Structure formats: structure tokens, C-alpha cells
Amino acid sequence: MSSILEVKNLHKSYQNFKAVDDISFHVNKGDIYGFLGPNGAGKSTTLRMILGLIKPDSGLIQLDGGRVDYSNKKYLNQIGALIERPDFYKNLSAYENLKILYSMSKLKDIRIIDDVLNEVDLLDRKKDKVGGYSQGMKQRLGIAQALMHQPSLIILDEPSNGLDPQGQADMRELILKINTERRITVVISSHILSEIEKISNRMIVINKGRKVAEGEVNQLMSSDSIKIQIKTDSHTAIENYCKTHQIPFTNENESYYLQWEEAKINELIKSLNSENISLYEVRQLKTLEEYFLNLTN
């Protein structure tokens, strides 16, 4: 399956703080791609670089095979976005808020406003002032705004933030509808494990600005992921090993976390020993929740 979005070796630092540290991943056309990590992991920074809101220090971002051009509105219109807790004019109606966006665009058919409001089940409330909307309604209005330019890809940053369980379920249903009926690829950022598990077919896990895992959700859940804790100071050796073999990893208190196949654990240990990297614990993690917690704690 062809990729719609490719991110390669992305870096972003603020003074001495590495917000994003050498992140690479790809999103296939038609995916609902989960972006999972704790608060402060670097999720929002990465997504804002893709959207052109933040300039990366280095790295490559490609959309449909072409390098991004943030000065090109045609490129920007290919990506819709719901930024966490979208802001609207509270004293204006939903329709009036979207009409402002329409007036600043090159869109030629004003019926698009009713179309996107209907898509998010707000058409019958389009004349109501946004100040009276619930948080869930505001989130849906944000998605309507993201759909205005009929993008091929939408990025949703914490779309279920602040919603009750029913609101979260409604949001998942809406995202699935957009993905299947409009054939829009979705990147969804969340720290809610169940949200990613229930809706995404592929995902990335990041922590402290680094990628620690990527793959199909069911494979990450069913595969055996191991925790490696070294007993020597050969940190550089194991990091170089992981990079050479393209194994995502993170380093926490002299422990290294990476994903590996159960049937090949002995093969991995022998290979590491051949590099003079001694191990004194190999622990298997079974569930997505346990996997996530051990990767990010």
C-alpha cells in the first residue's frame, strides 16, 4: 500500500531540550494511524511540524511523495487539522464561524458549509451560538472546519480530550465514518490507550521525543515485547546495535525497551552477547497497556 505521509529523521529542540529526537514513520493511504504517548512525549510538536505551524530543525516531511512546501496553500489544503481544544468565536453561530473561514479561502461553493456540518451532525444546530455548545460539539465543529477543503489527510490532536465515555464513543464513530465514507486518511494523537486500540489499524509509540515502537496495532498487542536491562556501561554499543538493525528503543535508567519476536529472543541475546553487551534481565510484556506503560514510564 502506498504512503500518503512520510516523516524521516525529524528533529526539533528548544535550547537544550530535545522535543523531537530523530523520529521517522510513514502513514499509508486509508490508514487510521494512532499517535500514542504520554503528555509531553512530543506528539503535538511532531504534528505541528507536519502542519507547518512549527519549523523543524532538520528532517524530511513528504506528502504524497513530494517534499512539503509550507508556502504553498495547495499543499496546506491537502491536510485538515483539529488542534486540541479548538477555539471559535463564542458569540457567533457554527455556520457564521465556518463562513469566516470560507470567505478567506478560494472555495467557490458555499454549500460546503452545510455539507461538513451535516457530516458531524451539527446541521440542525448551525444557527446556535458556539458559546452554548458542549465540549463534544466544539470538537465536532473543529472536525467540520478540518473538512472544509476536502483534504486527503486529517490530523486530530486529542479529539476525545475532555469528553465523557459516550462522547468518546461518538467521536470514534465519527472518525470511522470520515475514514470509510470520505476515504480520508486519519492521524489521531492520543494518550488514551483504549481510543487508539479501538480505532487505529497502525500506530506509533513515542516517549521523550523518540520513537519506541511502530506497527500494526494487533501485531503490537499480540507480539512479545521485551525489556532489556544492561549490566555494563556499554550504552553506546546497544544504541548503535538498535539503530543498525532498525529496532526502535528508549533508554530509561540503564534499561532499554524494544519490540521483538518471542521465537527469536535467544537469537537476539546471542547477537547482543557477540557485541559484548551483557544482559541480566529479559522480560516479556504481553498487553498493549503493559507494553505502553513499560515503554513510557
Kindly give the residue locations of the regions a language model identified.
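Generic beta-strand hydrophobic packing signal
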Residues: L10, I23, Y280-V282
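ABC transporter nucleotide-binding domain
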Residues: R172-Q259
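Generic alpha-helical secondary structure
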Residues: N72, H235, E262-I265
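ABC transporter nucleotide-binding domains
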Residues: L5, K12-I188, L193-N201, V205-N207, ...
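Surface-exposed charge patches
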Residues: I100, D115, N240, K270, ...
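Positions that flank functional sites
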Residues: G132, Y257, T287
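C-terminal coupling/interaction segments
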Residues: W260-N297
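Primarily ABC-family ATPase nucleotide-binding module
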Residues: M1-S3
